[in-house]
């Protein structure tokens, strides 16, 4: 146990370094927090009170770093949302028919299809009845909405990636929904892509709601600067996020202060490599 605590302390401290090694360790802080929690309870159970106290210090250190950018235990939002709104996020699908049927079956208000592999298939001919293809089908990211879109389009993110956005009227006012997938991009390209997203958000008059895979943890420096520059918040807590708890969390819902995150769950992947995620909000 002593060796484990020494390693945890070293990794937790080294994660503050600005070099590549420090940034690599920094993305694992949530796992350091979980491991410190387990060590603390194990030490308490075996009456190793000094080790338990040291584990508590490491737990608090990593907790405060993580919670500075993302809710850890409870989702964000002030509980003022009145309209329930369901979204499905599907990165890089190869079977549009499966994801369209899933959206229809789940009665999703919005479907984000990010960087699809179309193989010559046109989305416009597969859109379920009662849904609207928010933009043309050029083989890039797009949105499908149950509400008539006010406007829609894409943002080039570099590296062949694109973000899809759509403006919808909900409860008498406009909201802009933006979705993308930055996973697998280099750190430099991720930061460039966030710069493009930042410029888009800054130019919008209506509240912007962002959901997808940022390819980095919310407490990373680049993500922190992005949130601060737009006064946005991460809304989903880490225990309800739609990814593996044993891996660094990179999938988030980001929005304005009053936006309420109601929950999320992973859905069956069916004919696609990546499983879609169902996200529920109150707007």
Describe the role of every protein-language-model region.
Residues 1-124:
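N-terminal, active-site-proximal structural segment of metallo-dependent hydrolase catalytic domains
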Residues 92-105, 115-283:
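Soluble catalytic domains of enzymes that build or remodel membrane lipids, polysaccharides, and related
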């Amino acid at each position: 146990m002593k060796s484990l605590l020494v390693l945890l302390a070293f990794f937790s401290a080294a994660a503050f370094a600005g070099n590549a090694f420090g940034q690599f360790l920094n993305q694992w802080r949530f796992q350091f927090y979980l491991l410190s929690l387990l060590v603390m309870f194990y030490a308490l159970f075996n009456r190793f009170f000094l080790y338990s106290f040291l584990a508590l210090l490491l737990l608090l250190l990593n907790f405060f770093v993580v919670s500075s950018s993302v809710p850890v235990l409870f989702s964000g939002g002030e509980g003022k949302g009145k309209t329930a709104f369901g979204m499905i996020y599907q990165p890089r699908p190869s079977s549009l028919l499966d994801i369209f049927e899933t959206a229809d079956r789940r009665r999703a208000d919005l479907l984000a299809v990010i960087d699809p592999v179309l193989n010559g298939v046109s989305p416009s001919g597969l859109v379920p009845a009662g849904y609207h293809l928010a933009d043309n089908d050029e083989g890039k990211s797009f949105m499908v909405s149950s509400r008539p879109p006010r406007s829609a389009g894409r943002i080039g993110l570099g590296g062949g990636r694109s973000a899809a956005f759509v403006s919808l009227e909900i409860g008498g006012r406009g909201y802009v929904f933006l979705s993308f997938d930055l996973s697998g991009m280099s750190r430099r390209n991720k930061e460039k892509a966030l710069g493009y997203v930042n410029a888009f958000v800054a130019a919008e008059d209506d509240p912007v709601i962002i959901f997808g895979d940022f390819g980095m943890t919310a407490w990373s420096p680049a993500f922190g600067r992005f949130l601060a520059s737009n006064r946005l918040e991460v809304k989903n807590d880490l225990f309800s996020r739609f990814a593996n708890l044993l891996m660094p969390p990179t999938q988030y819902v980001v929005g304005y202060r009053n936006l309420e995150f109601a929950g999320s769950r992973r859905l069956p992947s069916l004919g696609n490599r990546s499983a879609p995620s169902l996200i529920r909000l109150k707007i």
